[in-house]
């Protein structure tokens, strides 16, 4: 069954001509990491299967481990390199609560500010200039004071991308859900390979010792059989 990349706008397929291109399955054993993979791919209502893969071109170089003969992803690797990183091309459901609060506060400002500037002759004047020049009634000033503190939050929410790029995390961060989490996996891999190599040497030595013991036991049995034969032949020769 040919392998093809599941990322949006990616047509890479498995081919023996491109040996440097590798394909990696989704981390179903880690639900939080799997959710980030699915969000970054940028496909609406996408549900990966057990054999769904993504090619290595969507990962940064630091996402791969330096040990082993083939490309292995680190335990916290997340695909972040895509061709649709333009926010106008990103399609996903608006589930960011910060963006919803930003949209609500911006709509509230649009409702309050026209009421404050209703008595002005030029309604198309700049918003900041109108706020400085107008002498607002007490109730209107109260509305503006309630709305103005939310302006930084609304600006931050509008400036924040609502696509999958806003939910990405840098691959350098190490997830530490527990205080006893293993962080230095490279050194542990190196120790594991050294231990396996030493174990192989000891296994070969054990096989050699067993072979020597078998030879010695066979010689001992042959020697005992020869002595028994001589003991039986001795009385017959004397008679």
From Swiss-Prot:
GO molecular function, one term: DNA binding
Zinc finger annotations (THAP-type) as residue ranges: 1-82
Pfam families reported for this sequence: THAP (PF05485)
GO biological process: one example: positive regulation of transcription by RNA polymerase II
Effect upon mutating residue 178 to A: Abolishes interaction with HCFC1
Short motif HCFC1-binding motif (HBM), span: 177-180
Keyword Zinc applies: yes
Modification Phosphoserine occurs at: 122
SMART domains in the record: DM3, THAP
Protein's job: Component of a THAP1/THAP3-HCFC1-OGT complex that is required for the regulation of the transcriptional activity of RRM1.
PANTHER family attached to this UniProt entry: THAP DOMAIN-CONTAINING PROTEIN 3
Subunit structure as annotated in this protein's UniProt entry: Component of a THAP1/THAP3-HCFC1-OGT complex that contains at least, either THAP1 or THAP3, HCFC1 and OGT. Interacts directly with OGT and HCFC1 (via its HBM).
Protein name, per record: THAP domain-containing protein 3
Taxonomic source organism: Homo sapiens
């Amino acid at each position: 069954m040919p392998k093809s990349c599941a990322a949006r706008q990616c047509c890479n397929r498995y081919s023996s001509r491109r040996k440097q291109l590798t394909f990696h399955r989704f981390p179903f054993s880690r639900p939080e990491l799997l959710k980030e993979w699915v969000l970054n791919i940028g496909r609406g209502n996408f549900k990966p299967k057990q054999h769904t893969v993504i090619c290595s071109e969507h990962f940064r170089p630091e996402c791969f481990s330096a040990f082993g003969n083939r490309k292995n992803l680190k335990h916290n690797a997340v695909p972040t390199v895509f061709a649709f990183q333009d926010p106008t091309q990103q399609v996903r459901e608006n589930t960011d609560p910060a963006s919803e609060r930003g949209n609500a506060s911006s709509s509230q400002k649009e409702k309050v500010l026209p009421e404050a500037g209703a008595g002005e002759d030029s309604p198309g004047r700049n918003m900041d200039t109108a706020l400085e020049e107008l002498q607002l009634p007490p109730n209107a000033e109260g509305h503006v004071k309630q709305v103005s503190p939310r302006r930084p939050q609304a600006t931050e929410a509008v400036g924040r991308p609502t696509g999958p790029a806003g939910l990405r995390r840098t691959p350098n961060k190490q997830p530490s859900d527990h205080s006893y989490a293993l962080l230095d996996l490279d050194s542990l891999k190196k120790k594991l390979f050294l231990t396996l190599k030493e174990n192989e040497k000891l296994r070969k030595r054990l096989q050699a010792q067993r072979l020597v013991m078998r030879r010695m036991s066979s010689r001992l049995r042959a020697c005992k059989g020869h002595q028994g034969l001589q003991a039986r032949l001795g009385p017959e020769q004397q008679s």
